[in-house]
Each structure stands twice: as C-alpha cells, then as structure tokens.
Amino acid sequence: MSGKCRKIMYALVVTVFAAFLWMICCENDRKVSDKAIGETTVQSMRSGEKSVSLEQSDIPKIEIEDLTDAFTVILQYASKDMLAGCTVDESFLMWFYAQYGRDAVIHIAFDVLDGGNDPDVWYEETGNSIHVLWLLYCRDSGFGQHELENVYWMQTAAASEMVFGFAGDINFAENWYTTEYMKEQPDGLWDCFSEDLLAQMQGVDVMIMNNEFTYVNKKGATSVYGKAYTFRADPQKAELLEIFGTDTVTLANNHVYDYGKRGLLSTLDALDQEGIPYSGAGRNLKDASKIIYYVMNGRKVAFVSATQIERSKQYTKAATETEPGVLKALHPEKFLKIVEEAAQNSDYVIAEVHWGTEGMLYPDQSQRHLAEQIAQAGADVIIGGHPHRLQGAAFVGDVPIAYSLGNFWFSTGTLYTTLSKVTITEDGTVKLSFVPCIQQNLTTRILTEPEERSDFYEYLASISADIGIDVDGVVYHKSADDYPAEEILYDSDTSRTDIIGIADNEGDAIDIVGNLKEDR
C-alpha cells in the first residue's frame, strides 16, 4: 500500500472512531455532575442543579448538560485568540476528548462561558498549549501534514524550563587564523574552548550557531569579486558543529554567499548531510523564509532569522522565488510578515538578526528601529550579530534584546564574548542571560574568577541601556513593574537614547573584524 493510501485509510479510521465516540458520549454522558467538572465548576453551580446557565453580553444563555453542549459552546463561542488560529472542529474535539477525557472538555467550555477565552486554559488542562495540541492532532489523524514541516520535537533537561543557547561568530575557513590555530592543537577544536563552556553549550536544550562562512570545495570555487573578506571551509568541517551541540544554524549573514550561488548550495548540502536544520538562507525564498519550530514541555517555540547586511554593495544575494540566497531585512516588510506568522502559529518567537556596523560597541539607529518593528510584529526575544563586538542589552517593552554577541571564535584580538541563553520558564516568563566569556589567543573560555566575572558584567552593564543584571547574568528591564531591585548586582544607568556607535579598537590595535592589526 502506498504512503498516500495509508494516510487516507488512517484518516477514515480516525473519522469512524470519532463518530463512534460521539455516539457513546451522547448516549452515556448526558449529565455533567459536580464531581465530573471539578471544584472550579462546582463553585459556579448552585447545589442540586443539573445544568449550569451563564449569561455574557456576547454569549446567549447556555445550559451544558452533555458533551454535545460543551462542543457547541467551544465551536461557536471560543475566541480566535483562544483557538490561536487553529481550525478547531468536531473532529479535533473528539480527538481531544479521546486523549484527555470529558472533564477537560467541560472545563474548556466553562472557560468560554465564563468569558475567559484564555488560550492558556488548554495548557492548564493538558500540559500542552493549543498549538502543540493541534500538532499532535495532525500527527495522529493524518490531516494537515504540512503543519508538521520544520517541526522538531525536543527533550528538555528540566520539565520546569526550556533553554536556548546562542553564540556569536565562528569561522572554520581555510587559511584563517582560527582554523590554522585549530590544526596545531592535539585535539583540534576541542582545545580551542574551555571544557566548561562546551559542557554548557551541549547542556542547553537547543543550541543555535551563526555559520559565518561557506562550506564549499576549493576546486572550482570562485569568491565574489571585490569583497574584502571571503571565507571558505571544506564541507567536511560541518561535522565540527557537533562539538558545540549544535541543533540549528542561522545562515542569515553576509558571508554565506562569499562563493556565490555554488558556495551557498554547497553549504546547504553540507548541513543537510549532517542533519542540521538551517534558517535565514535557502535554495529559494520559500526555503530561506521557513520558520523552524521546536516543541518542548508542551510549548511550541518559533525561530526565525534574517540579515540587514549588506547595506550598500549587495555581494550577498537575496533569495528569490527561483534563486538561492539569504532572507534580507534591509527593507524588512517580508521578514516582519514572517515574524507575524511565527507569532500566530507558536507560543513564543525568537528572532535572530544580522545587523549593525562592524567594530561598534553600541547599536546604531537602524538596529534600534528594526528591533522595535520586530518586537511589535510578535517576537518575544531578539538576538543580534555582525558587529564583531559584544554589544549591550536593552528592552523594547518587555522584549529583551541582545544587540550583538560578538566574536565567539573568529579573530586574534582579545574581546569579550558570551554564550547567551534564552530561558522560558514553566509560568511563561522569558529570560535573557549572558554567560561571561572571553576570546583570547584564539581560545574562548568562560570567565570563572570572581573578579573576572564582575568586570565582565560591569562592562556589559556599562554598554547596555536601562537594565539590571543579577548574579546569574539575567538581565531585567529597570522600568518593569516586577524589577527585582534587591537582586541586581550590576546596574546600567545609561538611557538607550544616550549612546550610538563608538568603535572599540583598543587604541587602533584591533581592526573592525576583531583581529590584531599586527597579525595582518
């Protein structure tokens, strides 16, 4: 039997089973007792009542006597926000009933009648958000299989939180400083990072790296004419990403097209060979624009990325309907629509953007403006890169921003860098934190000495805007109502309007990409 036939047969079985359950429900579950609907429902019922009548301004008087009534309430009166855009119908509700039981259905219906229409009620009842429930339904029923594309089901280290890790620029390019140093080490790339740093990277639930070069064989490869820096790595080096515990890479940068169309396609092939999903570039615009979804702890998290660079000379080609390239955000309308789509189809959105100006300590006006647009489009946190310097943190409303993670392992200069973590807690709080690191002598390590750590966080606070930093490197918005002033160790007293630009070149000793000028 073909795969298509199997899907059709499976769908028929599910439909018949749903109809069978429906008849059972109507025959045997006519009344909803106090015990069945639980204490919360009992509070809304008068003692001895056989049904519940609630009246809302926009909902007629409804009596829930059985599951048919409950289904009617949900299907007719649940808000779009509560259903989160999912095409919930009787088939979905029968599947939901089969999985979670009558009480869960009744509680959902009463939330609608109570005027709550809170999408979190699905998670509270089942441990899965409506977005995850919809994916499970599609997976089990055989319907809406396109919904399962680019969805990755992940295991978390802790049931109470989801942790994403992000690092700045890395470079495996041939004849580049980092790669030449790696070749000299007994254990190669392992010797280029401290053990505790690699352990933390491998320990997060999802590790996302910025692939700031292209994978293509030397034979026949031609770099883009006129570009000052072009980076090419042997495709076999893609396997090195495993050392970082890499789950996804962003290709939305200004070097993935250094060797033209051939180089980009070779890069995509190399990542496909390693089974590593990529974002922000692709074989066409659809591929470059795809949203990656992670399902963990009953929540669905979206990841999107784009590049604002280059601004003048367009060495890096934008993807089109038929041609490979990157997803550009210099004119951000397309990217903002993707962020909006991600927000509509997930519980949280993480956006990563290649932006800013090389060598700058502070974000420029274009970064700030784009950050505001991305936040308004629905992102819950924004991660930045490209300036080859660690830039500070800030907030747009309640959306935390890491403007630039800097060079993670890219250059010869001594520069602060970080492993940035995005933690989503069980109660839905999104936290951005920074692990203090330094790139020095072509090796990157965590700063472990108390004085070193203090210096790092004081520096981070000094280049940030309107934030406080606690002992764990978590940043907080000083204007937030729940700002934990008593827990703050490092305080930024700088207004985000006070600082723009300012190069960090250590007295002109380091160039804009982070190399010591004496090494060139």
Predicted regions and their residues:
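Acidic, metal/ion-coordinating pockets
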Residues: 149-520
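Residues marking helix boundaries in flexible regions
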Residues: 9, 25, 38, 60-63, ...
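Short amphipathic alpha-helical segments that mediate assembly, nucleic-acid/protein binding
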Residues: 38, 64-68, 119, 144, ...
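A charged, solvent-exposed segment within the mature domains of Sec-exported extracytoplasmic proteins
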Residues: 66-91, 274-293
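Zinc-dependent metallopeptidase catalytic helix centered on the HExxH motif
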Residues: 43, 48-83
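Gram-positive cell-envelope targeting signals
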Residues: 1-47, 53
